[in-house]
Each structure stands twice: as C-alpha cells, then as structure tokens.
Amino acid sequence: MNIPNSVVLWKDIHEISDKLCKYYGLSYSKIVPETRKQSRHFGECRPCQKCCSAAHVDERNCNEKILSIRIHHLNNPRKPLATSTILRTLAHELAHLRCWDHGKDHRAFEEELVNHMRELGYRIV
C-alpha cells in the first residue's frame, strides 16, 4: 500500500505534538494544514473562533487554539518541506501555547521544545 507522504507527515506531527503537550501540560484544539492565504508564514497559532468572537475573552487565554503548519512548498504542493523545517515550525507554534508573544521566554521555550524533540530521536538542524 502506497501511503502519501503528507499522511505520514501529519501522523508524525500529531504524534510529536501529543508527546510534547503531555510532557509540558500544553493543550490545543487541532492542527490543520496551512493554507495559501497564510503564505507569508510556515505556521500559525490562533485562538478558536469562539474566543475570537467573544468580546469578554482574552484571546491569549484560549485553551482551544488552532495550530496551522505548512508541510509542502507553496509553488510545488507535491514536494514536502524538509522535516527539520516542519519540526522547527511545530516547536515555534507549540511555544505560543505557553508564551503568546515572540519575546525572550517564547524563544527559550521554543528551544526547549526543539531539544526535547532531539531527545525523542528526531533530527532537527
């Protein structure tokens, strides 16, 4: 049976994110493929629609955030990005679950996540 590369990538992404979230006590609603509308970024972490539309909810405190991860080149959707790039993007977006901005704490936690991925046996440049 020939399994498409993107299916394997999504399986791996979910497996890795589940391990990291369990270890660090993080939570999100779902991970979805990034769309062409988000072509300037490799990923995105955004609050769920319910929190976005509620005037009284601080979006940073949403427990049901949605992660978008790009796994293919925009100009060649059949060609996946390098695994290292995808895993770095995943670490960056998961870091937003704890540190919403791009400050020093976010960068430090992102590196901690990358190092944990390496300890789990994933190769990240």
Please report, for each region that a protein language model flagged, where it lies by residue:
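Active-site-proximal or metal-binding-adjacent scaffold patches in catalytic folds
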Residues: 1-88, 97-125
